[in-house]
Every structure is written in C-alpha cells, then in structure tokens.
C-alpha cells in the first residue's frame, strides 16, 4: 500500500515516479489495481483498476503502461499499438519477402503478405484496419491497399516509373505518395473516395518521403532542391512550400 512506501529512500535513489499494484485472479478473470506515485512530492497521481481475462493479460499490461506514460509525459502512450514491417530471407539465390504486423515489442507476429518480389513502405490507416504498401509484383513498384480483417487488397497505382512512399492521412481520406510518371519524383495526394490524384510539387529536384501533419492540411517531405536533402513543409490549400 501507499503507506508502506518509504519515499525518502526512493528520493535517495533518484527515482521520480513509482508504480505499485495488486492482482486478484478469480477463475479466468484478472482484476489489477495500480497506482502511480510522484516521489518528490510523495503524491498519489492516480489509482485505477483494469479488468480482463487471462487471454487479455498482455493487452492489460500495455494499457496500464499507456496510462502511466501519458500521466507522466502528457503524451499518449504507444504500448498498445502495433507495428508493420517487412522481412526478407534469402535462400537458394532467391529472396522471400514478408509483410508482417506485431505488437510494438515484437510479440504476436502475423503474416499479411508473402511474395518473391520486394515489398516496401507499409503505412497504417488511422483506424488500424488497413495498410497501404508498395509491391513490385507487377514488375514495377505499385501501391496496394489491403484490409487486414479479410485480406482483400486493391492496386491503387499502375504508372510507369516510381510509385512509392505512401502515407495515410490522419483523417483517413487521402494518401500522400511519390510518383515519377511525368519524369521526376513529385509529391501527389490520392483521394481514396474519388480515386483522384493531385500533383502538389513541380520541381527539377527529387521530392520524396511525404508525411502528414496531424490536421491533414499540410505535408512535410524531403527534397534536395536546396542542394542537399532537407525537410520542407507543403501547405495543401495554397501549394506553398517552406
């Protein structure tokens, strides 16, 4: 209990916060009571309860970590999120590529796509139900969209040249991507509902790696238009680049 905590000893050790808790198991059901304590002020920050089955114990642990992290930093925790990544294994002069998702610590791996052709640049939808990525299965890079629940997938681009670096907007309505169909790598957006491409840059330099601002109204991207690779900001409404 909190009364049993010797805050002075923890201060000497340089600890800033403590997390204490207790676990009650009843059949297949867990009830976890946990508290966050601030050492310097000997203050209770919060006490909360998390409940779930044995199968949910990993998710409960991640949820508790998220709560503690956000209370300390003011930033939403990422412990309950997942990562998408590509692995490659070479055997008998052939390379097998796998698009995978897993918990952030690598647990609960799940195969999404397996191919003898390179897979690149997976990007999550905001609701974490879909991925977009680049696959070379058509003989050139193309952007695909895939539903994680039913494995349905759709090819979104089929242009000559580079089709790459897809990035899903936070509002879920558009993709930012790089196309070189007109000769030079440029930044485009793709309206997922209207299936319409809009070109946003027109420069002799290489523009690539677009990423969205949280409000979905602007992009940051990498360009060597200044002589070396630098990060630029593009306002979508007026096309201004800074």
Predicted regions and their residues:
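Short, solvent-exposed, polar/charged sequence segments at loop or secondary-structure edges
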Residues: 1-30
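Short loop/turn segments that connect beta-strands within beta-propeller blades
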Residues: 40, 103-107, 147-151, 191-195, ...
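A flexible loop/linker signature enriched in serine peptidases of the S9 family
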Residues: 76, 88-98, 114-117, 134-143, ...
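Residue-level detector of Asp-centered blade-edge/turn motifs that repeat once per structural unit
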Residues: 77-79, 126-127, 170-171, 214-215
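Hydrophobic beta-strand positions that form the internal "hydrophobic ladder"
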Residues: 83, 131-132, 172-176, 219-220
